[in-house]
Amino acid sequence: MIDLNSELMEQKMKVDFNTYDLSVKELLSMVNDGLINIAPEYQRQFRWDVERQSSLVESLFLGIPVPSLFMATNVDGTWEVIDGVQRLSTMICFAGDDNVREKVNAKKVEPLKLKGLSKLANFNDKRFADLPVGVQNKFKLTSIKVITLSDKSDKDVRFDLFERLNKGGVNLTPQEIRSCVYRGGFNDFLKELSKDSNFKNCVHLSESQENDGTREELVLRFFAYLYDLDSFEHSVKDFLNNYMSKADKGFNYSENDKLFRTVFKILNDVLPNGISKGRKNTPLNLFEAVSVGAALAYMDNGKINTVGIDEWLKDKELLKYITGATNSKPRVIGRIEFCRKKFEG
């Protein structure tokens, strides 16, 4: 019989939280000093309207409890916002100076002018600078509860927490969450390669995908399937998370940079319409098959045979591997191996 209590205790041991009561002034100071980071993935999605921002400010003035801010502690001791970016950004847009606002790319936005307040009607049409110093100080000294996930917590727990807390707020894609959780050299490497011109010509994405981390995820898929295919079971998300958490160790950046750029230079030369199969956007499973298959062939032979590629991309056997239950391990292996053999000639 499964010991439910043991399972509960095992999972709880992976999570370590600390709780703080911080004033608005302290939070703004921490943002200004770089101790609190709001990831670019969050910054681009700050979209509360003026009325909603004003309502939060009114609640803070009146001492009405607002939801806690959730942060994750990084290895260097800084905090990363997990949940509460809209609330923190509102405080910054209302009471932050130019230096603080610049930290969240809000310097070009006009300071918040309160609107639609019902309890504090005389505060409407006022900015922070328009308020008496005593009123400003009361706002700055308002306390906010902050809960931080310590850096001792398991990386998978951090990813899970980001995912859970963002389901009702800012909708980040799995790769945007990875970019927040697995910060470091490998994450920076993915972002750099995602800008490669040949790669961009080969892979066609929708407008929304161009801005949600999909390009970085495709670079991650390329290396994950190239080097860690044996670890893949069925969940692509878990597979990519696991690879990203360990890829930084012993990864040869210079060799893999050269490999990636070489493969996509060759593919771009022979696929003027990209990896598309006649579609506007590139199917992810076809991308995996063609790019990883080409890389394996190049690693084995120092070249990629592209003769007849237009014909064999229409082959019924390949079609079988990229339709239906495409994330089953046999089909992933099947489509990559099919392309590898074709590229080897």
Model regions and ranges:
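Eukaryote-biased recognition of C-terminal alpha-helical segments
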Residues: W312-G345
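C-terminal hydrophobic structural anchor segments
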Residues: N268-E317
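Short, Lys/Arg-enriched, disordered terminal segments
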Residues: M1-M9, E337, F343-G345
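Basic- and aromatic-enriched surface patches that contact anionic nucleotides/nucleic acids
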Residues: I2-E26, A39-D238, L318-T326
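Small-residue-rich helix-loop
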Residues: F232-N273, R279, L286
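Glycine-rich phosphate-binding segment of PLP-dependent enzymes
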Residues: M30-N37
